[in-house]
Amino acid sequence: MHFGKCLVRSVFLFLESMDKHIENSAEYAGLTVNNGVQQPPMVNPYRTKKQKSPALSVDDYVTGILNKNMTILSQAVTLVESTRAEHQEKAQQVIERCLPFAGKSVRVGITGVPGAGKSTFIDALGMHLVDSGHRLAVLAIDPSSERSKGSILGDKTRMEELSVAKNAFIRPSPSAGSLGGVARKTRETIVLCEAAGFDTIFVETVGVGQSETAVHSMVDFFLLIQLSGTGDELQGIKRGIMEMADGIVINKADGNNIEKANLAKAQFRNALHLFPLPESKCLPKVLTCSAVEKNGIDEVWKMITDYVVFTKGNGFFHEKQQRQAKYWMYETIDEHLRNSFYHNEKIEQMLQEYEKLLLEDKISSFVAANRLLDTYFNKM
């Protein structure tokens, strides 16, 4: 008992001496240790929590877009891209209100092989338009990872001049695995941009693929960016994408590459003469340019405007837009039916059951699909 008391007292004295800094005693003459300073709190205690901004109404969105408010336009595009049901409902109301103010722009789809310099080309051509008094919206579609579904959204960083231009609006969006590398909501975003007063819309796609029909079905002019020495000009491969193109530009025609670019230009022209005449009755032109040195950029824009004037004159421009509207009506119906089917509670349960039966080879894919569809339509 006595030992315990002594131990407690010893510990107390030790702690007391530590608190009073034993170094200040006479034994340590000449050495002084001051008491420490209490550190301020890591978080400001007087800081008030930032209040969350109230959600915008449909009227707020429409008014902001028509008044060319870029912040509200960006928020409206985010609303359109959202997958939440309440956001989708509000987005559709905003789009319907904006439709009467849309349809007055020139829509240009830009595609090409990876590394062809699409973003740099858009930066150069876009600055040419902005300097000429146009208002330009660029919808840059970035590829999404098939594994993580993520996207870098780095296209805007490569458009150094255009990204800070006053009359330019750049919106990078993930492709999210949609058809042709074009985000599903790009069509609706175009409507919002047109209502905001943009007279020219660029849609940059992920790259050349078999299903680039999506971008072709929402633009007035389809531009293919190519490089010299890729072999396409010799073999005539990627015939489908070349048949869709309303114009071809050989980029990076600078330095030691000028001669190769001119050779590729001649070979592409020869290849195009073997194709049937397009529905527009306007034979696609092939030009060379250097986006870095900004050579040939004005000729590219003249090619686009000449095409628009020609097709408006023969009625193809209006006919094509009507055909596109019909195409997107069916696409929207398909998407809504697909979403309705897969979000049905009964179908979700049955899908798991039939997946198990398929893996056990107890049922065929076609029988399983028919039973699921029958159940879905009977419940309706």
For each predicted feature, which ranges?
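Non-catalytic terminal/linker segments enriched in charged/polar, low-complexity residues
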Residues: G4-R9, F14-P100, E348, Q352-E353, ...
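Nucleotide-state-sensitive switch-loop elements of NTP-binding domains
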Residues: S57-T111, A116, I122-S211, H216-I225, ...
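Long, well-ordered amphipathic alpha-helical subdomains in the mid-to-C-terminal portions
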Residues: L73-Q75, T288, E299-F377
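Alpha-helical scaffold elements adjacent to nucleotide-binding pockets in ATP/GTP-utilizing enzyme cores
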Residues: I152, T189, A214, M218, ...
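Well-ordered beta-strand positions
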Residues: T200, F221, D246-G247, N270, ...
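Flexible active-site lid/hinge loop adjacent to a nucleotide/diphosphate
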Residues: V215, T230-E259
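Canonical P-loop GTPase G-domain recognition
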Residues: A253-V309
